[in-house]
């Protein structure tokens, strides 16, 4: 969708939001007045002994309850349009390069070398750019796919098919995002606790009493009924009530433990039901979306199951009121009844809940992969090659401002590419551009360029290497470990691509050049592509090994340095180190 479309939709949603806000405010005043009026009329009728006023008080109370029901619907609409407005705003912010303000940046996943080197997680990261998840499972699934993208061509092509279909379902995506935004809680343990609780056996604790409880309820009802006519039955009635309360207390801890997981996300159940209903009612053609939909829509089990669970969780919430708890359990073993219905629900749906939430997480993943296209970035779908290849046109860094980013074109000639150029000229950014776009390719998403052809390759990096005081690892030794990992992986003869920035910068020039030449020789294999940046021009002419030389240039104007950030063939002929030293007054 274009920016103008999002802005128009945002304005319409904002108008709806303001309309329902005003309506909600009016209804709040009306219901307050009706409640006060009902109380006042009741008190006047009581003190002035006018029974007719009791009727009016009752009518005002009924009217109050009606207004409460209407107000609840209005508040639901208000909440919906508030969430929809926020969804539109996020799309607008993403298009306007303001996406790095989004709360979720996946910093907790920033652990491995590649994630750090390629800015996959954390502030201003790939995750922060494309993330459209709203559940813990969805967030985890997206992170897993970024860290370990698929290298299966068939799966990549199936996901591309999914994204092509989603391009015709923008309203569906907006509905999913809106109800996702309405989630009350995001506690990462809540749903897992709930799912884990379903696998436990709770039935045995009440099996021996299953016939006693209904009998006690029946006795209580009969006692209460006959107590009107038979005064001596009061004692039996009281005994039955006390006995039921004792039984309730005995089972209180076990029941509370059973109900706790579902109670935690009770307020989100209606939203989950709506999400499952939206997915169930949509028409899909691609195989992955049909499989996903089948997990949810088979016999409408997800929608029906969550609807029943919502009613049970609502019943569980009444336990919070002490007076209501005593009354309901004294008259009808309320806790035991809820337990009975809940365990029946577990028996009917417990084994299916995991696949429902997994399917929802998968839909969140697909929407996240579609985000670059939906938000009108200049993207395209890559072509996956069966042979070792890498080429692209006008490929851009996904995280750089769309108004400033410069695209580059490339076609692999030799498997080894040595890149030279001045400081800040764009060498490292170019490698990150390729790395991030390859990850997007393998995830089945879009690349920020045109005509990209790539093979499925394991990505290895040596870029942001730092020393580790705790482990006693210097920067140079850290680099050695990274290079060793690449060489060891190359022995498996699986397709791989390596990105090495400023190779062996942590040691002297003599050792650096010797080590770099040895690395080039080790990685010059048919199944390996490597990109290596360096300031050592000696590496541009490596005997007996065919490598391609590329460079980035700078130019000077009015005693200032400028960069075009364009990749050029051949070895760099310029340096800017001394110029920068002079500019800063060091020399």
What are these regions (language model features)?
Residues 1-421, 429-458, 481:
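Alpha-helical coupling/stalk and coiled-coil linker elements that connect catalytic or binding modules
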Residues 68, 369-587:
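ATPase nucleotide-binding head domains, primarily ABC-like/P-loop NTPase cores
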């Amino acid at each position: 969708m274009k920016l103008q479309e999002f802005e128009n939709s945002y304005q319409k949603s904002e108008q709806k939001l303001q309309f329902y806000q005003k309506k909600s405010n009016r209804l709040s005043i009306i219901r307050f007045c009706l409640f006060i009026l009902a109380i006042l009329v009741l008190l006047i009728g009581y003190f002035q002994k006018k029974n007719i006023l009791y009727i009016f008080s009752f009518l005002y109370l009924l009217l109050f309850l009606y207004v409460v029901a209407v107000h609840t619907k209005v508040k639901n609409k208000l909440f919906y349009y508030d969430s929809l407005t926020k969804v539109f705003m996020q799309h607008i912010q993403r298009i306007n390069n303001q996406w790095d303000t989004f709360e979720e940046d996946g910093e907790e996943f920033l652990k491995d070398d590649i994630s750090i080197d390629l800015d996959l997680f954390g502030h201003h990261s790939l995750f922060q750019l494309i993330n459209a998840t709203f559940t813990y499972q969805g967030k985890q699934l997206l992170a897993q796919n970024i860290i370990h993208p698929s290298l299966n061509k068939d799966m990549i092509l199936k996901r591309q098919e999914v994204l092509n279909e989603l391009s015709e379902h923008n309203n569906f995506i907006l509905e999913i995002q809106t109800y996702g935004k309405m989630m009350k809680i995001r506690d990462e343990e809540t749903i897992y606790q709930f799912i884990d609780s379903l696998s436990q056996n709770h039935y045995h604790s009440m099996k021996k009493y299953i016939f006693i409880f209904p009998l006690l309820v029946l006795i209580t009802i009969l006692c209460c009924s006959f107590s009107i006519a038979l005064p001596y039955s009061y004692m039996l009635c009281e005994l039955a009530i006390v006995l039921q309360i004792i039984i309730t207390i005995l089972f209180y801890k076990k029941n509370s433990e059973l109900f706790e997981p579902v109670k935690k996300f009770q307020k989100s159940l209606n939203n989950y039901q709506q999400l499952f209903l939206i997915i169930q009612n949509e028409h899909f053609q691609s195989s992955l979306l049909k499989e996903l939909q089948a997990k949810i829509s088979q016999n409408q089990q997800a929608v029906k199951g969550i609807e029943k669970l919502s009613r049970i969780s609502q019943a569980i919430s009444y336990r919070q009121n002490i007076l209501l708890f005593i009354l309901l359990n004294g008259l009808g073993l309320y806790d035991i009844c809820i337990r009975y219905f809940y365990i029946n629900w577990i028996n009917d749906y417990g084994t299916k809940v995991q696949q429902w939430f997994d399917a929802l997480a998968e839909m969140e993943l697909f929407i996240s992969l579609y985000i670059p296209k939906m938000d009108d970035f200049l993207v395209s779908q890559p072509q996956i090659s069966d042979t070792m290849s890498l080429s692209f046109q006008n490929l851009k860094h996904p995280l750089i401002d769309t108004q400033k980013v410069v695209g580059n074109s490339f076609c692999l000639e030799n498997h080894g590419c040595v890149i030279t150029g001045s400081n800040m000229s764009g060498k490292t950014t170019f490698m990150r551009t390729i790395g991030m776009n390859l990850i997007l390719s393998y995830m089945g998403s879009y690349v920020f360029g045109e005509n990209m052809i790539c093979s499925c390759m394991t990505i290895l990096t040596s870029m942001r290497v730092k020393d580790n005081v705790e482990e006693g690892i210097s920067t140079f030794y850290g680099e050695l470990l990274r290079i060793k990992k690449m060489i060891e992986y190359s022995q498996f003869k699986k397709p791989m691509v390596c990105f090495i920035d400023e190779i062996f910068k942590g040691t002297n020039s003599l050792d650096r050049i010797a080590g770099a030449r040895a690395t080039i020789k080790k990685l010059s294999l048919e199944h390996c592509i490597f990109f290596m940046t360096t300031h050592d021009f000696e590496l541009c002419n490596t005997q007996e090994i065919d490598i391609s030389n590329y460079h980035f240039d700078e130019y000077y104007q009015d005693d200032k340095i400028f960069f075009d950030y364009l990749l050029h063939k051949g070895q760099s002929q310029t340096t800017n180190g001394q110029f920068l030293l002079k500019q800063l007054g060091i020399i």
